[in-house]
Amino acid sequence: MTQANLSETLFKPRFKHPETSTLVRRFNHGAQPPVQSALDGKTIPHWYRMINRLMWIWRGIDPREILDVQARIVMSDAERTDDDLYDTVIGYRGGNWIYEWATQAMVWQQKACAEEDPQLSGRHWLHAATLYNIAAYPHLKGDDLAEQAQALSNRAYEEAAQRLPGTMRQMEFTVPGGAPITGFLHMPKGDGPFPTVLMCGGLDAMQTDYYSLYERYFAPRGIAMLTIDMPSVGFSSKWKLTQDSSLLHQHVLKALPNVPWVDHTRVAAFGFRFGANVAVRLAYLESPRLKAVACLGPVVHTLLSDFKCQQQVPEMYLDVLASRLGMHDASDEALRVELNRYSLKVQGLLGRRCPTPMLSGYWKNDPFSPEEDSRLITSSTADGKLLEIPFNPVYRNFDKGLQEITDWIEKRLC
């Protein structure tokens, strides 16, 4: 089946698809303060979704392309769930968030098919995969159209990997008590086995969102990167996120001695946002299997246990948390009680001495991850490094922070 035909088949109208902002039915807090964060973007009036320009540009999307798609959404006069929110157009049609970003992805998909140069074609496929992922953002459970966009993203990513430098292998991992999960092992040029970083991504991202991290930071140093989706999304969608947040990643770690391309004696974990919750749990529970753990903007305690902090967080992000926990109809009070159980301090881990070296990077006044969370992580180990990343200029400092983190990981792996 051609890519174009796959797109037509997946998005063929069958019934009135639920609109993304309606999928989680919590009691609304009302007006929220504006939020700006390096890793999550910022709240913009009249948008349900946080607009995450930094990360989208970092993944290779042109800022003008972002504005063009936003303009098409704004200009639509189609019916919306909430007339005050541009990105709540109902149905797969012009103005709908998923429709507009997927349409943009199809433009690049067609360019990829027409391009004869393999590397350039691979770049176009990767661009299409990223746009399909933005279409599916924030990846709420039960969002049928978003899940179809994710399927197209994975397909485009596989096409890209066949053409881009290095080697990528799609791997299946068995997890007792449930469905197997699929991960992607990205390997640099040269002979393996390679030192490897196990990526633990954020809750509002897919494993295919981190190719830039591999290409710009790990591959030049001869380090491989292994990704899996977080519980409840993508290839891990059959698994619900539980208080044992590191369950899937633990089973992957245990399987690495049987993966010939990975040097299982030289493995580190790297956690973005809630992925740091997973990575730090691994530091405690699987320390013999890990040389180091690095975190960026970690969500390990405060956001999960502090009501005032939760009140500062945008509705969309709380919807993401509720969706991952399978609490689509829960009250805010029930959600708060459940989130508290995910705090690694409440679980009795953070604060105890940890044998694994840990680094944590943070931004001052980050509404999702205060400095205290990073200090809690780095003070729990004898080999801890606290890294403050200045906010402005945001892109340059983000890149500099990732270079420093990669330096730190490399010293412990190589």
Curated annotation (Swiss-Prot):
Going by the record, the broad EC class of this enzyme is: hydrolase
Gene Ontology terms, MF aspect = carboxylesterase activity
Reaction catalysis annotation: a carboxylic ester + H2O = an alcohol + a carboxylate + H(+)
Q: Which Pfam families match?
A: FrsA-like (PF06500)
Coiled-coil segments on the chain, per record: none
Claim: Hydrolase is one of the keywords in the record: yes
Q: Which InterPro entries does the entry mention?
A: AB_hydrolase_fold, FrsA, FrsA-like, FrsA_esterase
Enzyme Commission number: 3.1.1.1
This protein's UniProt keywords: Hydrolase, Serine esterase
Family from the record: Belongs to the FrsA family.
Against PANTHER family, the record matches this protein to:
DIENELACTONE HYDROLASE DOMAIN-CONTAINING PROTEIN-RELATED (PTHR22946), ESTERASE FRSA (PTHR22946:SF4)
Q: What does this protein do?
A: Catalyzes the hydrolysis of esters.
The protein, known as:
Esterase FrsA
Write down the species: Escherichia coli O17:K52:H18 (strain UMN026 / ExPEC)
Q: What is the lineage of its organism?
A: Bacteria, Pseudomonadati, Pseudomonadota, Gammaproteobacteria, Enterobacterales
